[in-house]
Design a protein with these regions (language model features):
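C-terminal beta-sandwich interaction modules and adjacent acidic
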Residues: 1-192
Length: 192
């Protein structure tokens, strides 16, 4: 292999094809990773990488807080080694459980991206990304830092507003939390 070939991805078209455009978090994510190589290529591994963003938008009276953060990347192997020839059409099917990215309150939205990856030793990975709509549940914590008891719910389709363990008003807990976050954000230096 030439020195410069190590820095270039193999000449292979890759596509992540999901069977559905929308899923519930309890569903199996099904589909296939499709390769159409323009050169002979040895794939070491097929995997799916889940990531994305979590967006918080809270407003109470004259106070508001918005924040976006990255979700933890979760890598799930879905297949092993395969050698594909130039001009050969190859499809690698998969069926996996969707990793859980729960929403902690009614002010948080989760957007997930799924990347199909084919790794080639010594060369850049082949990747293709899709953004399925995945309905994630609420997992609500009665946060001790803001006057709660620490109880955490099982996954729920709708957010609860009262802690099932201590009866604490969770809206008040969230308001304390996001009011404090908004004050801290206002104190931070602004970057332009």
């Amino acid at each position: 292999m030439g020195l410069f070939k190590k820095f270039k991805a193999p000449k292979v078209k890759i596509e992540l094809k999901l069977d559905e455009v929308a899923y519930d978090y309890k569903d199996k994510l099904t589909g296939r990773i499709v390769l159409d190589p323009e050169e002979e290529t040895s794939v070491n591994e097929f995997r799916l990488e889940f990531g994305g963003s979590k967006k918080v938008k809270w407003k109470k009276g004259f106070s508001s807080y918005s924040f976006t953060s990255s979700l933890e990347t979760k890598k799930i192997p879905v297949g092993g080694q395969v050698k594909v020839q130039k001009g050969q059409h190859y499809e690698h099917p998969f069926q996996i459980d969707i990793p859980l990215y729960p929403k902690p309150d009614p002010f948080t939205e989760v957007e997930v991206k799924v990347k199909g990856v084919a790794t080639v030793q010594g060369r850049p990975d082949l990747t293709h990304e899709a953004k399925p709509a995945i309905n994630f549940p609420y997992v609500i914590e009665c946060d001790r830092d803001y006057g709660g008891c620490g109880f955490m719910t099982q996954p729920l389709s709708e957010p609860v507003k009262t802690c099932p363990k201590c009866g604490n008003n969770l809206e008040e807990v969230w308001n304390r939390e996001y009011s404090e976050e908004a004050r801290e954000a206002a104190r931070r230096p602004q970057r332009f």
